[in-house]
Amino acid sequence: MTDFLPFSRPTMGDEEIAAVAEVLRSGWITTGPKCQQLEQAFCQQFGCQQAIAVSSATGGMHVTLMALGIGPGDEVITPSQTWVSTVNIITLLGAEPVMVDVDRHTLMVRSQDIEAAITPKTKAIIPVHYAGAPADLDALRALSERYGIPLIEDAAHAVGTQYRGEWIGARGTAIFSFHAIKNITCAEGGMVVTDDEALAERIRSLKFHGLGVDAFDRQLQGRKPQAEVVTPGFKYNLADINAAIALVQLDKLPAINARRQQLAARYLTQLHSLPLQPLAVPDYPHLHAWHLFMVRVDETQCGISRDDLMAALQTHGIGTGLHFRAVHTQKYYRERYPHLHLPETEWNSASLMTLPLFPDMQDSDVDRVVAALTSILESVRD
């Protein structure tokens, strides 16, 4: 029987196991030296000015928007073609999410759509670097500067991505994810990076109860143990067990992303003759991290719906994903914004399918996926 091929699987080895064992033996397993080392290594690798490790990218988004003072009466512009957490956070803060359409072929938010949505209430713009490719930052930064609106990059898919020769995160404010399926992972975790020192300090406080320091800081830096709450905060700090794994993964990132690029290139070559539509890569200079390999299933061209094709692949022992169902089409937001219509987003939301892509895949795994797709699509055309 052929083994099941998931759409993603973390790449772990003896180095990660040894790193966790080292932390367990140290006696300090929560936020501590490994977390500090991870922040420093992230800055060194990507040219960031400030890096704040957090327990998830969602938590990072929460404290970043809070640090910007976003709340009731404010508006935040972001695409609907994104993971729900961003829009959830905006909503939970009492602000209004202003969801805009994306480019049909790349899924990148377009500067003209953002500009059309700007009002005097707009307090932040959150573009998404999608599937490992970067959004067009020159155009987005120009908007941010022209209107004086903070730009917060959702870089959950973009660790190791470059835009015009510059690492994502080297400038401005960006939020990365270390979730289990991301290019580097520590099971759960994230990193907020920024070149705004004052913003970084507010985020550091908010991610740990609103205190200015954490327990490790108080122990080693000689600060008063009676640390005071500056403003009410949360518990979004990253534990050293997770940070130790992330440090090893960060060191492996160049090899991880290189393998992802090889697998993606093999897919693109072999899928050329099938009626599936892979995402287009942006035409501006960039380095793609290939977090996800996505195709669009147009039922009129393929003779089968996206959902039925996913089910058929499952019978072949092949897993798939859906990244993502548009936020405004989901029950809560559909009822709250019944008249919102985003045609490019809605077409993609109904047709997107993520194929298996992870560094431990063999070339033969790509061949197997393409062979299964070919067989299924030929059978429905007969």
From Swiss-Prot:
Pathway: Nucleotide-sugar biosynthesis; UDP-4-deoxy-4-formamido-beta-L-arabinose biosynthesis; UDP-4-deoxy-4-formamido-beta-L-arabinose from UDP-alpha-D-glucuronate: step 2/3; Bacterial outer membrane biogenesis; lipopolysaccharide biosynthesis. The modification N6-(pyridoxal phosphate)lysine is found at residue 182. GO terms for biological process: lipid A biosynthetic process; lipopolysaccharide biosynthetic process; response to antibiotic. CDD domains: AHBA_syn. Keywords: Aminotransferase, Antibiotic resistance, Lipid A biosynthesis, Lipid biosynthesis, Lipid metabolism, Lipopolysaccharide biosynthesis, Pyridoxal phosphate, Transferase. Its EC number is 2.6.1.87. It catalyses: UDP-4-amino-4-deoxy-beta-L-arabinose + 2-oxoglutarate = UDP-beta-L-threo-pentopyranos-4-ulose + L-glutamate. Gene3D superfamilies: Aspartate Aminotransferase, domain 1, Type I PLP-dependent aspartate aminotransferase-like (Major domain). GO terms for cellular component: membrane. Pfam families: DegT_DnrJ_EryC1. Its cofactor is pyridoxal 5'-phosphate. One of its GO terms (molecular function) is pyridoxal phosphate binding. InterPro entries: ArnB_NH2Trfase, DegT/StrS_aminotransferase, PyrdxlP-dep_Trfase, PyrdxlP-dep_Trfase_major, PyrdxlP-dep_Trfase_small. Belongs to the DegT/DnrJ/EryC1 family. ArnB subfamily. NCBIfam families: PRK11658.1. Catalyzes the conversion of UDP-4-keto-arabinose (UDP-Ara4O) to UDP-4-amino-4-deoxy-L-arabinose (UDP-L-Ara4N). The modified arabinose is attached to lipid A and is required for resistance to polymyxin and cationic antimicrobial peptides. Homodimer. This is UDP-4-amino-4-deoxy-L-arabinose--oxoglutarate aminotransferase. It comes from Pectobacterium atrosepticum (strain SCRI 1043 / ATCC BAA-672). The gene is arnB.
